[in-house]
From Swiss-Prot:
Subunit structure: Component of a multi-subunit COQ enzyme complex, composed of at least COQ3, COQ4, COQ5, COQ6, COQ7 and COQ9.
Regions crossing the membrane: none
HAMAP family the record matches: Coq4 (MF_03111)
UniProt-recorded name of the protein: Ubiquinone biosynthesis protein COQ4, mitochondrial
EC number: 4.1.1.130
Cofactor: Zn(2+)
Catalytic activity: a 4-hydroxy-3-methoxy-5-(all-trans-polyprenyl)benzoate + H(+) = a 2-methoxy-6-(all-trans-polyprenyl)phenol + CO2
Lipid bilayer topology: Peripheral membrane protein
GO biological process: ubiquinone biosynthetic process
Length: 332
């Protein structure tokens, strides 16, 4: 019995070795087959798409053609056909989901502009945009803006021209604000999720004019300045996203920032927004050479206290107090 038991060990080892070799051979064969047949499948797809014998080897054209096919296929699954370039129609449940997700992301990650953009469009309800349209139709300049549909970019504004304007002009004020803040008119995202083409333009116009509201009031793009401008927009134009930003964004601020907002900038924004001319009807591009102080008077805008100066003064005081405290500690 001992001999029989001992003689089984080499047999088992041989069997295990055979099984291991067999698995290795099978795995190798499957890998090789997948490579060969997978390559053949890719070749077949290329032949079907007419890409195998592309003598020009125009990869960019091929990618564009593929993208067009995907977009066409995607458009067939949408509730309506796209009505302007870049339009992405959404079902009601998709719009609600976009609103909820972008709203949460905007609250926890306000530094991500994409979230703000999506929240703005998903909350731009048709009745709000229709109200803005009626406001524009009731104003001569507003009607002309709707008719001409201008586009605010670095090229249309001619930045070289702006920097040569009079120091007190709107154009120079706007130009220096852009340089100071490190932004450009070209950074505004295109509208995608608003179905009506005219309403889409109105929202684009509101979005593109946002920096003029900053510049004419001397407010930086730091969070306190953004909240103040959002409150101004909400009071002046009734933009839901602006109202949400003005209400919820302060919850994440430091106590001293909240104090400045509630004591100075939010009261100013609401008072100014309710009393000044509807800003959606201002043709900013035609007023670039106008004296900025005269324009403020015409619009009914009185700029708030300089936010950067207030912050710098507080920072200076804190540094002086820290130096005195450190000197006291050394003296002890």
């Amino acid at each position: 019995m001992l001999r029989l038991g001992v003689s089984r060990t080499p047999i088992n080892r041989q069997f295990v070795g055979y099984e291991q070799r067999r698995h290795f051979i099978v795995a190798s064969a499957l890998t090789l087959g997948g490579f060969v047949f997978g390559k053949r499948a890719k070749l077949a797809d290329a032949m079907e798409n007419g890409e195998l014998h592309n003598k020009n080897n125009d990869d960019e054209a091929i990618r564009k053609d593929r993208m067009d096919k995907r977009l066409k296929k995607l458009s067939e699954t949408r509730p309506i056909k796209p009505r302007y370039e870049g339009h992405v129609p959404l079902y009601p449940h998709e719009r609600m989901l976009l609103f909820a997700i972008s709203g949460l992301k905007s609250f926890f990650h306000p530094e991500d502009g994409n979230n703000i953009v999506k929240l703005g469009e998903s909350s731009a309800f048709p009745f709000v945009l229709e109200s803005l349209k009626q406001c524009m139709l009731g104003d001569e300049t507003g009607r002309r803006i709707l008719r001409e549909q201008p586009n605010i970019t670095s090229d249309t504004l001619d930045m070289d021209r702006l920097k040569k304007m009079d120091k007190n002009s709107l154009g120079y004020t706007y130009y220096t604000w852009l340089i100071t803040e490190g932004v450009s008119p070209d950074t505004r995202a295109p509208v995608k999720y608003i179905d009506d083409p005219l309403q889409a333009f109105i929202f684009k116009r509101y979005r593109q004019c946002h920096d003029f509201y900053h510049a004419i009031n001397g407010l930086p793009i730091i969070i306190e300045g953004e909240i103040a401008i959002k409150a101004l927009e909400a009071a002046n134009m009734g933009i839901p996203m602006a109202a949400l930003g003005a209400l919820l964004a302060p919850l994440r601020l430091k106590p001293i920032q909240k104090e400045r907002l509630y004591d100075i900038y939010l009261p100013w924004a609401i008072r100014t927004g309710l009393s000044c001319k509807p800003l959606i009807n201002v043709y900013w591009e035609e007023l670039l050479e106008k004296d900025v102080n005269e324009l403020r008077k015409e619009l009914g805008i009185q700029p708030p206290p300089n936010l950067r100066a207030i912050r710098q003064e507080r920072s200076k005081i804190r540094k002086e107090l820290k130096m005195k405290y450190d000197a006291y500690e050394v003296g002890m």
